[in-house]
Amino acid sequence: MLSTQVDTDKLNEFVGRFLGDLGATVHAGMVVIGERLGLYRALAEGPASATELAVRTGTDPRYVREWLSSQAAGGYVAYDPAADKFSLTPEQAFTLADENSPAYLPGAFQLALGSLKSVPRITEAFRSGAGMGWGEHDSDVFHGCERFFRPGYAANLVSSWIPALDGVQAKLAKGARVADVGCGRGASTLLMAQAFPNSQVVGFDYHAESIEAAREAARRSGVTNLRFEVAKAKEYEMGPYDFVTVFDCLHDMGDPVGAARHVRESMAPDGTWMIVEPFANDELKDNLNPVGRVYYAFSTLLCTPSSRSQEVGLCLGAQAGEARMREVVSSGGFTRFRRATETPFNLVYEARP
């Protein structure tokens, strides 16, 4: 009965899309393996056969051959059949082999694989309505999240996001008190401390494991004008702070209005709050695109369960949009709110008392 109602061309198109998704899903594991074994970095040194790449990396040639074949089929490496050698184009190397590149993406796959380990818990949460706290996820989520967002922060935070705010760059250069709330493993906090040595920067997060990793990163960097403390967004120590930041985490909070209110209370009268959120339009119909797809999926696995696990449990989700964020910030006591700048992956808001 159903077969008579199915358009064969549309069916084939959908099955083809499904096949692409299946390939992409298992390919995520290939990317993580390649990064952890240094296969991309070694291949960036020059074209190689499977055996040559195995020698460079101290790995098994047969496994490497199969891995390279999967990469070539996915368009992640180039293959020369005449020479039976593989290589990385400059664009592939920029994205896969250079961790300092603003386009470095393997961390996103680590985050994705870590998130998928929580599927059994999230499946049950659909039935029970329960939450799942950030700290309950696999450690690949914490590592991958930092490594997913860090390239974008490194490329934009100091060079374009802070300059887009009214008067903030000059304050930071002169010397200001800065609070980075929900700092995770401290990537954004460290960037600000390094860029503005006259300012005192403190990062807060309720996840103790991430704070310990942030402290270790600070020790390795040698930067002395920052510290990290374990604290919830509604309980971190009062300032007054000249500049408060939240990076890609306000929507994860159970009570973002309460967090906004605490930010307002902790700020100097002429302070600024910078809110960085995943790029989103206000309406679902305008988010039906590749970026929205990624964020809605992560929101189902990570963001919504995180918010639901906390008091209030507002569950804004990773695609809340500007209008919803304006409501939250205004309810927290701020009178001025604007979109300061944006990238394809982030929206940057400026709020003032």
Language-model features: locations:
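Conserved Class I S-adenosyl-L-methionine-dependent methyltransferase catalytic core
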Residues: 5, 9, 16-36, 41-42, ...
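Short acidic, hydrophobic short linear motifs in intrinsically disordered regions
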Residues: 47-55
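Conserved adenosyl
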Residues: 115-251, 256-258
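Short glycine-centered segments of the SAM/dcSAM-binding site in methyltransferase folds
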Residues: 177, 271-272
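A short glycine-rich, Lys/Arg-flanked "PGG" loop and its adjoining helix->strand segment in the class I
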Residues: 257-269
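C-terminal alpha-helical "lid/dimerization" subdomain adjacent to the S-adenosyl-L-methionine
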Residues: 276-331
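Core SAM-dependent methyltransferase catalytic element
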Residues: 332-353
